Regions:
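A residue-level detector for short acidic-glycine micro-motifs
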Residues: 51, 74, 90, 115-118, ...
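Conserved, short, structured surface segments that act as functional micro-motifs
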Residues: 101-102, 125-169
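Short, small-residue-biased leader/transition segments that mark boundaries at the very start
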Residues: 2-13
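Short glycine/threonine/proline-enriched tight-turn/helix- or strand-capping micro-motif at secondary-structure
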Residues: 26-34, 50-82
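Short, acidic/hydrophobic/Gly-rich beta-strand patch recurrent on exposed beta strands
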Residues: 61-64, 70-73, 100-105, 143-145
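Acidic/glycine-rich phosphate/pyrophosphate-binding loops and surrounding catalytic core
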Residues: 14-40
Length: 169
């Protein structure tokens, strides 16, 4: 048995476990009141799309699942900006995703920003649309979720009206 391989798998398991423990509980957090107003904006100013939302992944020539996130090629050092008003619920370095920021926009809507070069916000901090939350690296992976369901970010960005939310009752 190759010990290097088993150590490598153990490291992957540790990174995945750390990610699950930090991020997955956010999927089930109770929704707070709506914090955004107007449209959502792309967190990167200058970018090229590397992996688009819904794009089919191909590994080893075999077709796989569809991407739940969007990966952008970005300019290192440029600001990564809050896509909408909200509260930072996670801002830390995770072994699997690097510097990670999660913003709760209310009503169960959250943005997950992975792979930043640096963080400039802290957990519990309120942020406004367009406010820098960190510095971009070579690429940014962004995932927008309503609860635990991923949302196509381009639909959020294409209108100034934003995501509409109707209160029950």
């Amino acid at each position: 048995r190759d010990l290097r391989m088993s150590r490598g798998l153990g490291d992957v398991y540790k990174r995945q476990t750390e990610f699950r423990n930090a991020v997955w509980p956010l999927y089930e957090q109770p929704a707070r009141e709506k914090l955004w107003s107007g449209g959502f904006a792309c967190p990167a100013g200058n970018y090229m799309t590397l992996v688009d939302f819904g794009q089919t992944k191909v590994t080893g020539g075999k077709q796989g699942s569809k991407s739940n996130s969007t990966k952008l090629y970005t300019i290192p050092g440029d600001p990564c900006r809050a896509p909408a008003n909200g509260v930072v619920v996670l801002a830390r370095n995770l072994a699997l995703t690097g510097n990670t920021v999660v913003i709760d926009h209310g009503c169960g809507m959250r943005s997950y920003l992975y792979g930043l070069d640096a963080l400039s916000v802290s957990e519990g901090q309120s942020v406004e649309r367009g406010q820098a939350v960190g510095a971009l690296g070579e690429d940014l992976t962004m995932d927008f979720k309503l609860g635990s369901k991923s949302v196509n970010p381009w639909l959020l960005f294409q209108t100034s009206g934003g995501l509409f939310w109707k209160e029950n009752g």
